């Protein structure tokens, strides 16, 4: 089929990097992000914070980028990132639990977190998002706590892997038992483990 696009096209207003810088700055200035400067719990007026691994993990990663791209905002951005990371750590399963070091997929009763089938459950591979966030924060701050959390998540994944190499897509957040027979797509975990291997030399 022919592509439906036809020129001529207007010139770009700005290049990709500048557009990306504007985007991360916009996110940084959002009230729900700014609230992390003084809080270690999410502002639930932004109800997507109901997904800690995905959204709060992304908040941490965004703020590390802000610190790199806007040096005058670095202290503020890293304060936000650290408080968001504190929340993820506080919400994570303890070290002796089946899902040790995993933050939850769902938090409180907003959007899909309120569904009966999601209460007390977690999407197995979402902890990778939190792991990447901890690694980004470690890279910037050099604080061992964040690296150790990321490695702890990886260690738990090794324990969860089935004999056939698969992972359940969704498990009980306390027991770690699968809630159905569906298996997860593994690319988030492969990317996470590859980062640990290539960037930090971690092989397990």
Language-model regions: role of each:
Residues 143, 150-167, 171-204:
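Solenoidal tandem-repeat scaffolds enriched in leucines and small polar residues
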Residues 46-47, 118, 177-178:
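Short, recurring structural edge motifs at helix starts
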Residues 51, 118, 122-125, 142, ...:
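Structural signature of alpha-solenoid helical repeat scaffolds
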Residues 31, 70, 88, 92, ...:
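Alpha-helical junction/boundary sensor with strong preference for TPR arrays
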